[in-house]
């Protein structure tokens, strides 16, 4: 199996085993997301969700395990493969949104395509289509440092979609949005996943996001999977007090 060179082809599934040591505990997460599938990762603060995102994105190295997109190897600790983020072919939105502050929303969204060699005009046109899709067309010329939290989050999502990623890894991408914008942007993401046949790993605190988007949900606590199944299955038999609180039921053992 060879290391990936550039973006993996659209239509490939994501297969990963993430082992990352974190002080008193370690993340140990196995996930498989088919092309066009959505896996939602839920859990309390400090449970390992953002560490999983960082490991998938190439922001922290694996102590053991691998990340594969189809037949392409993005990381393999045993084989010494660890591609940098820009070579993984992923569309990533981090919980702490990172935009280039002095660039406009349009320039931020077009940045990846320009860096890949696309000419300025088509890159801008593509960026404008995505900004319109996420409801940010009126702020295309606004510098990123002047965007509100919700606007910056939508710009970051548009930037992730703009590079035609082979997979999406989104960490709390709707957290700063109001209810109307949240539903609209969720629909944009769902349409992209369905039409482009890309796998999506969605980290969220909101069960509604998981119910609306995900085929499968897993719950992480202290780096370990404590429950896995279809979104509606969580309410039937919550495995921990956190899951019971999430679904609005009595605690385990009550």
Locations of the language-model features?
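ABC ATPase NBD coupling module
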Residues: 74-91, 115, 234-238
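Conserved ABC ATPase "signature" C-loop
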Residues: 222-223
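ABC ATPase "signature
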Residues: 228-229, 237
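Conserved ABC ATPase signature
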Residues: 143-147, 151
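A short, proline-enriched helix->beta-strand linker immediately N-terminal to the Walker B motif
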Residues: 162-166
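Conserved ABC ATPase "signature" region
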Residues: 72-76, 121-139, 190-191
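Short coil-to-helix segment of the ABC ATPase nucleotide-binding domain corresponding to the Q-loop/switch region
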Residues: 103-112
